[in-house]
Swiss-Prot record:
Disulfide bonds join 25-36, 53-142, 119-134. This is Snaclec stejaggregin-B subunit beta-1. The lineage of its organism: Eukaryota, Metazoa, Chordata, Craniata, Vertebrata. Belongs to the snaclec family. Residues 32-143 form the C-type lectin domain. It comes from Trimeresurus stejnegeri (Chinese green tree viper).
Length: 146
């Protein structure tokens, strides 16, 4: 009887230690703070990478960051796989929200912007962000809530 209680208690401890640690993530995904993450080495443009992420799991998207700790966690997963490569993150079309004006204060009436949209990459070693044409291809990281 004592051995049964000991084994039952041990199983309960194991179960409780796994719950809330991302145990709900699929086996090929990594967990951090109730989210699941996966690095994909295949290079895609930003739009195709986002579509691919959405196909992987319900509510999955290109990775977003809520803190530097989360970004560091993602870097710890991307760097061993990709070394110094850039990866797509879920930030895109940031310039659409900017209100630009000339340095002399006059309104922007004429522009010669490239038709290329700009999206954001993150450097896998140090989390520095860079704008790149959304049509370029890079590896990417997907994220969903566990």
């Amino acid at each position: 009887m004592g051995r049964f209680i000991f084994v039952s208690f041990g199983l309960l401890v194991v179960f409780l230690s796994l719950s809330g640690t991302g145990a709900d993530c699929p086996s090929d995904w990594s967990s951090y703070d109730l989210y699941c993450y996966r690095v994909f080495q295949e290079k895609k443009n930003w739009e195709d990478a986002e579509k691919f992420c959405r196909q992987q799991h319900t509510d999955s998207h290109l990775v977003s960051f809520d803190s530097s700790e989360e970004a560091d966690f993602v870097a710890s997963k991307t760097f061993p796989v990709l070394n110094y490569d850039l990866v797509w993150i879920g930030l895109g079309s940031v310039w659409n929200a900017c209100k630009l004006q000339w340095s002399d204060g006059t309104e922007l009436k004429y522009n010669a912007w490239s038709a290329e949209s700009e999206c954001i990459t993150s450097k896998s070693i140090d989390n520095q962000w860079f704008t790149r044409s959304c049509s370029q291809t890079y590896p990417f990281v997907c994220k969903f809530q566990a």
